Amino acid sequence: MGGPLTAAGGRGDGGAKAVEPLRPPPPPDPKTMARWYQLEALERAVRGNTLAFLETGSGKTLIAVMLLRAYAHRVRRPDSRRFAVFLVPTVVLVGQQARVVEQHTDLVVKQFCGEMGVDFWDAATWRSQLEDGEVLVMTPQILLDNLRHSFFRLQDIALLIFDECHHARGNTPYACIFKEFYHPQLNSSASDPLPRIFGMSASLIYSKDLNPHNYSKQISEIENLMNSKVYTVDSESALSEYIPFASTKIVDFDDSNISSELHANILSCLNRLNKKHIEALDRKLHGSSLENAKQRISKLHHTFVYCLYNLGVWLAAKAAEVQSYEENSLSFWGETLDKNVEGFIRNYSEEVHRELSCFLKNGHIGEKFPADSQDGILTPKVHCLIRTLLQYRHMQDLRCIVFVERVITSIVLEHLLSSIHQMSGWNVKHMAGSRPGLLSQSRKNHTEIVESFRKGKVHIIIATQILEEGLDVPSCNLVIRFDPSATVCSFIQSRGRARMENSDYLLLVGRGDVEAQTNAEKFLASGQIMREESLRLGSISCQPLENTLCEDTYYRVESTRAIVTLNSSVPLIHFFCSKLPSDEYFNPLPRFDIDKASGTCTLHLPKSSPVQTVNVEGEGSILKETVCLKACQELHAIGALTDSLLPELDVPCDEEPDIVVENKIEQPSYFPEEFVDNWRSFSRLGIYYCYKISLEGCPKTASPTDILLALKCDLGSDFTSSSFKLPGGQDNASVTMKYVGIIHLNQEQVIIARRFQTTILSFLIGDDHLEVSNGIKYFHEMQVPIGVVYLLLPLVSGRIDWCSMKFSSSPIYEANNKHMTHCHSCKDIDLLQTKDGPFCRCILKNSIVCTPHNNIFYVISGFLDLDANSCLPQHDGTVVTYKDYFKTRHGLTLTFENQPLLAGSKHVKVRNFLHNCYSKKEKEPGDRYSVELPPELCRIIMSPVSANNLHIFSYVPSIMFRIQCMLLSVKLKVQLGPTVQQFDVPVLKILEALTTKKCQEEFSQESLETLGDSFLKYVTTRHLFSEYRLQHEGILTKMKKNLISNAALCQLACSSNLVGYIHAEEFNPRDWIIPCLDYDERDNKKISFLAPNGMYSQRKMSIKSKRIADSVEALIGAYLSTAGEKAAFLLMKSLGMNIEFHTEIPVERKISMKAEEFINVRSLEGMLGYKFNDSLLLLEALTHGSYQTSGPTSCYQRLEFLGDAILDHLFTEYYYSKYPDCTPELLTDLRSASVNNNCYAHAAVKSGLNKHILHSSSELHRKMSYYLEEFGQSFTGPSYGWEAGIGLPKVLGDVIESIAGAIYLDSKCDKEVVWRSMKRLLEPLATPETIEPDPVKGLQEFCDRRSFKITYEKNHVDGVSSVIARVKAGETTYSATKSGPCKLVAKKLASKAVLKDLIAGHKDTEAAAV
């Protein structure tokens, strides 16, 4: 491997910044710092495929960088989207080499490694990643996988660099790239270009074969495989003037064993402990956990024996001590222990440590090294290592690496060297691979250790082969091979770490070990031999590899060119199985039955796989690969593998929503066309359709009045006779609306009616007297264009009150002292001075006036026996005249002192009478609102106007808004089409479904949404279960999510033009459009026509996508609750949902077997109260995925998927119909209390279903046994509420759902049959009286009301979770600690305890609210 660059071609700091979007100035040309052999290698690489074979530290990476610069113009050509790929064998090298390329080129560099989740990327994701990438640095498996899945092709790559190319051997990813793709294309007649190949390595030989006569063959093989020729120098001396070489020395030691007696005693002790703990496992564990634990204890036993022989008693004891650490839950060979095994492993290790410690003498290790070695405390090899290191105590700034073979050796040697007081000045660390394991180290840990090593804070690193290649390690002045190198490559690379001047490379060899000494001599000579052989082969051309892919060794998808080979078939099957549904008791894995004698192999896939068994015959050495290749073909044929040969992780493309809906979208809010017209044409119609609107249940007025609504058209049968409530009014106010026929009005009458309604409504709604009065004054000058046009005519005794309308709508300025003809009812003409001049008393009486000095409107009921000089009592008890009061308070001088004061009252503004939160205690107008007004301060707005008209017209905005929404609901019914329109769904029920909670009206969509949501899931689940019979539960769940997600439902609503019908905001009377009134553009009250869908709109609204999705669900619920399942289903179809609702779902059986051979069918049927026609459905419903033995061919997961939706819908429908008046919150709580896995699990145990489940999981067996033993008596009560079944294994609840699915299928989709059977198991059901609130929710609500702070502290020890709940209530802190099998259980228990204490400590609050 070539390292990062320095000015001399050596290593640098690698600290380059990320490439910016805009290219920075190009870095200096590396050629200016290159050595002669680097330039020579570059020239060779430009001309043809080249393998650079040069020593570690010679600057091979610089050659790669210069080659990338030479190819820069090819990866930047806009007409050819090609790129360069830099392959490195380890993840840590990805970032390291990427930084080097970024530092020395201006190319756009991208890094890829497995932890980025690339295994799950599809072709589109990769295309997006490649859009601007010019150099891709990655591990070889990623490139190989991409080529196999055909995400990109070899011809897309202009330059392909292989770091540490000696890994190109056998079936490694490096080799497979050439065998599966490069050579087949090289040998084909295709004209597609192949990438330029450049490899680099410090050793071309990567084998244990030290026979120099075989070097030529191995070099030729790698040249032919990579279709490249080797470049190297003729000897080390050619490089010695640029890089220093270490002095290699052999350090021998007396390789004698510990005394035979001590050896026998310790070995006997280890064997005894191994046997003891294996026998204990047989008594306490079962199934896979037992086998797992036995294997691990056996491996540990061999490890301790190895340490005893090779390291000594002290280090063997230290190995046992390290393995017994509580935080160490993983064995050091990298296999994860299941939770039930951890304790047994620790106990075994602890006892081994105690026993071995008895063989150790008292005293500090290292006080007498020769004696320790002689007594077997340390082996002579370890003693030699210590002695050798101590010889370098004089060295300043020691940088030493000790290479060992095993991870455990590195760990215990760190402990030993750190314990020796003679080495107290040196800091010792160990480094091992980053795979999961004992004291596992992450790449971050490695980087920190190497950085400390570079800074001199760490002096000695005990390392496995991880430091031979990969990490950018500073040059060392001492490298020791504690364990011999396994290969020539290992020897050369470890020696290459010693690159400081006068450095030493020491080999520890046992005295008399002739083989080791011979191997060391061969290792030393190997470098020169490889150079000579490479130069000798230089003139021989590479030979193409023939038949690297035989027809029966691969399977190719023709449409995509994706390929799976014998090499990749086994990993692909394992990857496929890993994506099948699993749980904490079962990991889906393939199982192989191989009979080498007969040359047959049977592959058993998990029961959730659509293909269960595959059989092949063939060559014994590749049977497993062959059967997996055949399985891949079969899985692809049925769609379980995509055309890219990856597990089907997502739904088919045609099921996915086309867009991702943003959180909020802007849509026009619709307006009913029945209320829209052109004023000119409306006023000349002559014939109008009339509806009588009566307000009932309001406080009685002098003479109750009604309103006549006159329209251009008939509103339809839904409005022939209808009624609705006004919850914001008093005394249960309601409105009835009845069609009364057609009337004829002339244009003058229409104008009078228009003036009246616009005047009175402007007054009731408006605030600015100038705006209102000017609007009335210049009314006759305005011409209303297209807008909201209809008439509201007051009725008296069933007749239109034209008299009131005519006079009250006449312009006031015409009734001054010059024109008194209108005062026909006045006996005496008596003028009073007003703000606008003198007016007759009759004009002022029953008028609406405004006082401009404070801009307040008043209703005048008559005259008072008071004038400006009358006394006005003040709040402080003093008395002033009205004249003085207005002068002092408002700065107004009253000049007409003798005029009587007017009896006025403030008019109550219109409000939202649809609001559900109106308080009956709200103040009503009365004496407290009475005022005395001097006429000269008043401006007359309207006269005369009756109190009755004012009263009923104050309700008009709310009434007409409700009618407006009802009209839109009728329009929606029509829009949904004739198939849906045939069902008689009340308009108000549709309106309920379209009204969000935010509107705060008497009804909202929440309950209907809950009902519709359950039906939507039920129907969708049925459809998917029936249509995709080969897909497992995981895929079906993803499909369902995509079909009915908020994004998908929002998309449907937008496509169906449904959004504009939604009532998403609280009604504000100020925003209501007064009919027949012209509005300015800036008022945002203009009506516009939406050409695409033929609707009218007033404005645009911003609405969350979830609210839109909720409305779709609520609409489904409305049709379901009033017209049945067929209506709801047809509604879904009309909205564009591509689903089917078959009356039956046929069950296919591939094999025949008797369920009675596995389960007690008769007993189960008695328990369920149902007799199965196909008892194999019951068998499937009780089969857990871990039951991999022969027999049932499927596990319960698909039935669980079906049954979950059925039960959810049955319970929701039951509670919705059982408690029709319950609040949405209560409906949700009832549903949540009954429809959850804990409740189902409780019912399963209560009924004894747990005894019939087929499984092979010892952990599941242990958990069920624990609960039955500890809490058996608690399984007799109800199966609802948060405490029922809490903590029970989820499998128990799953079985209830799967049995529901089985009965549903067996009964030909009869929900009633399922309900009777499930109700039998789950009774008694929750009721509003028995439901218990969730304690976590209850505690949160309690604290929110009082602004208390809640904190939770969670812990998990030995499989038991504990939670501490704390509440800070003022100066007092309440806390409770509870334990449980999981954090959720412990949290609920702790919350319950704290809540109980809080309620007791705050008795002044109503406990009911909790």
Curated annotation (Swiss-Prot):
Q: Which family does it belong to?
A: Belongs to the helicase family. Dicer subfamily.
- Output the Gene Ontology terms for molecular function: ATP binding; helicase activity; metal ion binding; ribonuclease III activity; RNA binding
Query: What cellular component GO annotations does this protein have?
Result: cytoplasm; nucleus
Q: Report the Pfam families cross-referenced here.
A: DEAD (PF00270), Dicer_dimer (PF03368), dsrm (PF00035), Helicase_C (PF00271), PAZ (PF02170), Ribonuclease_3 (PF00636)
**RNase III domain: from which residue to which, for each copy?**
969-1124, 1161-1308
Which positions does the motif DECH box occupy? Answer: 163-166
What positions does the domain Dicer dsRNA-binding fold occupy? Answer: 569-655
**Residues at which ATP binds:** 54-61
**Could you tell me where this protein is found in the cell?**
Nucleus
Q: What does this protein do?
A: Probably involved in the RNA silencing pathway. May cleave double-stranded RNA to produce short 21-24 nucleotides (nt) RNAs which target the selective destruction of complementary RNAs.
Main localization category: nucleus
Q: Where is the DRBM domain?
A: 1334-1400
Chain positions covered by the region annotation Disordered: 1-30
- Species whose genome carries this gene: Oryza sativa subsp. japonica (Rice)
Which residues does the annotation list for site: Important for activity?
1290
Needed co-factor(s): Mg(2+); Mn(2+)
So where does Mg(2+) get bound?
Answer: 1200, 1294, 1297
Q: What is this protein called?
A: Endoribonuclease Dicer homolog 2a
Question: Gene3D superfamilies attached here?
Answer: 3.30.160.20, Dicer dimerisation domain, P-loop containing nucleotide triphosphate hydrolases, paz domain, Ribonuclease III domain
For the Helicase C-terminal domain, which residue ranges apply? 388-561
Keyword tRNA processing found: no
Per the database record, which ranges form the PAZ domain? 827-942
